[in-house]
Amino acid sequence: VEFDVVVEIPKGSRNKYEVDHDSGRIRLDRTLFTSTQYPADYGFIEDTLGLDGDPLDALVLLTGEPTFPGCLIRCRAIGMYRMTDEAGGDDKVLCVPTTDPRLEHLRDINHLPSFDRLEIEHFFQVYKDLEPGKSVEGANWVGRSEAEKEVQASRMRHEEQHADDDEQSGQGGKVALGGDQ
């Protein structure tokens, strides 16, 4: 299963950027209160709806330099960090670019060195620690198969939401072209 990830935050940043889905522009949401930094490029999988009501989150492992906010990367999942925060389910799909042969050996979560998994776990366990009202309440790793199932389920939630939006707006899935018809 391949998908596009929109990068919001490059690896090494303490700034938390978010795409404003209405304008398409990138907004600085906040600077992390802790001294931690993002362990991989971080963003979301396009055309998905996660359990938290936002697009499904993704971390992209790269062999070279970090990318930049707004960069689109074609990826495949190798696993997922199932996480619950103060607002509920907040899963993070761990993926690699489909175009990088240096990462071809990473096919499932167990192919990633355990220290790399621990580094990612540590980040998500502490990155909200100093923020009032925010917390991480539980998390565990699952493999590629579970990650791909969640990507598919999130795509279905996204499609259902947009079908409901079309019905409520009277469009019924049709796009008006303008003018007298």
Please state what every model-predicted region is.
Residues 1-165, 170-180:
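Hydrophobic N-terminal alpha-helices or hydrophobic patches in metabolic proteins across all domains
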